[in-house]
């Protein structure tokens, strides 16, 4: 299998990181936010951060 598949999947909002070409790649929802967002989780992030947050890769 190619990069970003299954357990090597790189998380991103709504699916997989751009450039990953594995059609079976499905990321589980990320709990923490990156992109300079200091909120504890995606829900807080969407309510209190001025910019949209990206998922952490873990």
Swiss-Prot record:
Binding-site positions, a divalent metal cation 3: 11, 16, 25, 27
Protein known as: Metallothionein-1
Residue sites binding a divalent metal cation 1 per the record: 4-5, 16, 20
Annotated residues for binding of a divalent metal cation 6: 39, 45, 49, 56
Residues binding a divalent metal cation 4: 30, 33, 49, 53
Keyword Metal-binding: yes
Residues binding a divalent metal cation 2, per UniProt: 5, 9, 22, 25
Residue numbers binding a divalent metal cation 5: 33, 37, 55-56
Region (Beta): 1-28
Function: Metallothioneins have a high content of cysteine residues that bind various heavy metals. Class I MTS in marine crustacea are involved in the sequestration of elevated levels of heavy-metal ions.
Residue segments, region Alpha: 29-58
Keyword tags: Metal-binding, Metal-thiolate cluster
Molecular function per GO: metal ion binding
Similarity-based family: Belongs to the metallothionein superfamily. Type 3 family.
């Amino acid at each position: 299998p190619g990069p970003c598949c299954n357990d090597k999947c790189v998380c991103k909002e709504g699916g997989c990181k751009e450039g990953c070409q594995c059609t079976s790649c499905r990321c589980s929802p990320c709990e923490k936010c990156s992109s300079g967002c200091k909120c504890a989780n995606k829900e807080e992030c969407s309510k209190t951060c001025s910019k949209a947050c990206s998922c952490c890769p873990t």
